[in-house]
């Protein structure tokens, strides 16, 4: 995993990824994720990295509070880590570069439309593929775009019981505004 990420890959860890107390560390991939859990073995470690960076690509279109579910307690950031969200000096979301690759740590991620969007953006960021965001994409996280390129069709789905407005981006990056009724599905030719 470390070699993959170091050479340009991405890794997303949720909760306690690769966690096993060994050689003074609990998170064995702490050099990729940039976080460690305080378990009484690293009390001598300086923990001064608490500044939040909520303007990050991963959080760009998620307003308000992020739901981490139960999340994890006692998580702190290593010095070169960028904390996206922390709560009472417990890291909830952080990012770190490792060699040519990137790692993302999320303390918990229960399913919701908003969290689905956050995970999607985390996948793009960790893969260094931010420029692919506006490809088969909806600006409203309650609305999804599904492309069936081989069949020459795509559909737009309103996942809610309420009308929604969005901007839909097609595979070529072109876009159009769309109003959808509750639970509506609209089909289009590519």
Predicted segments with their positions:
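A conserved amphipathic helix/loop scaffold
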Residues: 1-190
């Amino acid at each position: 995993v470390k070699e993959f990420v170091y050479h340009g890959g991405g890794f997303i860890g949720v909760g306690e990824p690769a966690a096993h107390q060994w050689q003074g560390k609990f998170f064995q991939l702490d050099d990729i994720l940039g976080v460690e859990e305080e378990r009484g073995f690293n009390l001598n470690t300086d923990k001064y990295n608490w500044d939040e960076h909520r303007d990050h690509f991963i959080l760009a279109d998620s307003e308000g509070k992020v739901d981490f579910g139960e999340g994890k307690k006692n998580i702190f950031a290593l010095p070169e880590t960028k904390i996206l969200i922390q709560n009472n000096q417990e890291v909830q979301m952080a990012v770190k570069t490792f060699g040519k690759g990137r790692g993302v740590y999320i303390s918990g991620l229960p399913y919701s439309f908003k969290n689905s969007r956050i995970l999607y953006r985390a996948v793009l960021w960790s893969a260094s593929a931010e420029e692919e965001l506006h490809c088969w994409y909806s600006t409203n996280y309650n609305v999804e775009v599904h492309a069936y390129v081989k069949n020459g069709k795509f559909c737009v789905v309103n996942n809610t019981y309420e009308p929604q407005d969005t901007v839909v981006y097609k595979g070529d990056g072109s876009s159009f505004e769309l109003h959808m009724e509750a639970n509506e599905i609209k089909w289009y030719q590519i």
